[in-house]
């Protein structure tokens, strides 16, 4: 069972780097970014309130293989506290996330998926580096613009 995943250099020091879009995490694991304070062995389940839209109950749990997408999830999630990135294992089948698949780019370059089944937390990445303040503000501004234009649709 994985608990904490750290990448170390030849001197044994933990290596951190800014997440890069479309780059699969070196572990190959599925990841989930959130602000929820959970423990190894807990399950993420459908039927909970959205991290991004107050009052909306989600039919799916969303996961990714890229650290960048998981970091965005952790940073943009509603709630107090620090963002967290969990290493997860789905109980059931995954499907491509239709919110990003074949949208701005063909295919599923963010390696983003969803499931209607529970997802078990098997570890946590604790040494990740977030996006710059400028990137965060750019994302917030872009989402606010979509909201103003009525285009902030989540296909769930």
Residue ranges with predicted function:
Residues 20-23, 52-53:
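Short secondary-structure boundary/capping segments within folded domains
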Residues 8-12, 41, 62-68:
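A short linear-motif detector with a strong N-terminal bias
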Residues 49-79:
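Extended catalytic/binding region for NAD+/ADP-ribose chemistry, centered on the ART fold
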Residues 2-5, 12, 17, 24-28, ...:
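Active-site and NAD+-binding cores of ADP-ribose-processing enzymes
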